[in-house]
Amino acid sequence: MIPDVSQALAWLEKHPQALKGIQRGLERETLRVNADGTLATTGHPEALGSALTHKWITTDFAEALLEFITPVDGDIEHMLTFMRDLHRYTARNMGDERMWPLSMPCYIAEGQDIELAQYGTSNTGRFKTLYREGLKNRYGALMQTISGVHYNFSLPMAFWQAKCGDIAGADAKEKISAGYFRVIRNYYRFGWVIPYLFGASPAICSSFLQGKPTSLPFEKTECGMYYLPYATSLRLSDLGYTNKSQSNLGITFNDLYEYVAGLKQAIKTPSEEYAKIGIEKDGKRLQINSNVLQIENELYAPIRPKRVTRSGESPSDALLRGGIEYIEVRSLDINPFSPIGVDEQQVRFLDLFMVWCALADAPEMSSSELACTRVNWNRVILEGRKPGLTLGIGCETAQFPLPQVGKDLFRDLKRVAQTLDSINGGEAYQKVCDELVACFDNPDLTFSARILRSMIDTGIGGTGKAFAEAYRNLLREEPLEILREEDFVAEREASERRQQEMEAADTEPFAVWLEKHA
């Protein structure tokens, strides 16, 4: 089932320097909660400055949903320490609140008034809040409080030059973009390995079902927790953060222009379903527009091609201008075993897997095959640890045992690891391979199995509160390592100044401005 990567691996072993200079970045979301696990109703902590313009700490959907962002970094340990500093400073500046350590929220009732993230009075800030109003009215606020980790990854120019010859200008844009689309297609085909190893949401609180019927064969504990005994990541299931109305958009990942055309079409295509919500009610705007996507960011995807946008530029226009610059991996649950929601083992694994995805042959993928890849993902998400589980290739009928496919993949990853270790020194990447490959013969080692044992003992709420309390105490005590207190104070002041400047510069009324942007 795994493509034959032997020639590409042999090429890599002859060109190890092609991997020198991998760049990455992390984003981590987490809900602010009270000591009893309920959602914090306070505003964004003052010490964290403006959520609209702060470089490192912002908010996602809700005012209580923090998002930490590291700068681009070539050093894994430095990046993780930077992320830890962001958590340390925040833990010291959020009063008695703490950070929820799980992807799935618990103590939130459907219909509870979850305050949308607030970004001030500038047109840009009001637009961001209106987008969230649209998300709430389309999908419900509860789904939007699910948290995850995003891992951003780019290969060095040396890799593309070694692989594609001496490239520059428009030629480089085309070839590098084609290379990243290969990564994306392989990710759709084999990325289920991420929830298998690192999925950490095998259970949900009963409030999450919102009284809706479900066809999933949930088991229920006395405290009202619903779980699937072999599930890995209910966050990635249809119960979690997905968008069924997008499944027939036909967006594919074979070509830059085709992809962008599909995305631009989706933001122009009217939706009957969303038209029923209305645009405005009693003088209050309910969504930006009633199209399938209000804006491009609404496209749900487990992986995204990205380029840093310029002021006023849409994500797709940035891609058209310069091609794909990096990949955003979006399938990581919060790691409940780490105070910062992600750890070095995961980052090193993702490095290995992304390199493998760039090397492995990846035939073009139709929208129907893309839909077929969802079958493997769903199996792993809902019953990934089930003995005897098999996976298929695309829409073909042949089936392969998951443990065998996993071990075959890791045979290749071990060779990538040897190459990365040869240029970085040490054996850190090989060690990660040795640790993780054991999960295929022993699924009890996976994150989902480990966290489910705790959840069955103490419930999701009990587990979440215990980790949150422990991490709060730990992070508050640890000294900062990279950033200093004065760096945070300076960024707070600078972010507030940037927001004020944006607000002062706006001359158009929001309604007029919105007509141009909706």
Swiss-Prot record:
SUPFAM superfamilies with a match to the protein in the record: Glutamine synthetase/guanido kinase (SSF55931)
Molecular-function GO term, any one: ATP binding
Reaction(s) catalysed (UniProt annotation): L-cysteine + L-glutamate + ATP = gamma-L-glutamyl-L-cysteine + ADP + phosphate + H(+)
Pathway: Sulfur metabolism; glutathione biosynthesis; glutathione from L-cysteine and L-glutamate: step 1/2
Keywords: ATP-binding, Glutathione biosynthesis, Ligase, Nucleotide-binding
EC identifiers of the protein: 6.3.2.2
Name of the protein: Glutamate--cysteine ligase
Keyword Ribosomal protein: no
UniProt keyword Ligase present: yes
Cellular component, GO annotation: cytosol
Organism: Escherichia coli (strain SMS-3-5 / SECEC)
Transmembrane regions listed in the UniProt entry: none
Protein family according to the UniProt entry: Belongs to the glutamate--cysteine ligase type 1 family. Type 1 subfamily.
Enzyme class: ligase
GO terms (BP aspect): glutathione biosynthetic process
NCBIfam families: glu_cys_ligase
One matching Pfam family: Glu_cys_ligase
